[in-house]
Amino acid sequence: MGRQNPSLVIMAEGMGSRFGGLKQIEPADPEGHIIIDFSLFDAWRAGFRDVVFIIKREMEAEFRECFGDRMERYFHVSYVFQELERLPEGISVPAGRAKPWGTGHALACCKGVVTGPFAVINADDYYGRTAVDFLAAQTDESCYADSNEMQA
């Protein structure tokens, strides 16, 4: 039995408060490509076939409009919602907290959707082909974090 193709998990839940909008879907070049387009192109070449977007529920319509048919021709696309209430049993949201918990919580929200090896990227960063190729080629059970290949 061969190794399962890895999933690409894209953290796109950010509130965009400093940017003033959804930076994740803003064009990054004159042709209208967004940063995620470049990451997905590299991911496809590296063998990723499943993409999971971690988003806010209220962003779903915009993401489906932006990525929907265009990306679903190449990838199996899933959307996961990072919601404050999705916490382990016995943990509760502190009064007044409105911001998401962070990366660990975002990945925990993928439980049941991501069932095999995966790589995680931020929607508004471009990591480059070398980084994506490296992550896709891993065959052991290790975890890797490398910011040396990241290009902002």
Give short role names for the model-derived ranges.
Residues 74-76, 81-152:
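Conserved beta-loop-beta/alpha segment of the NTase-like Rossmann-fold superfamily
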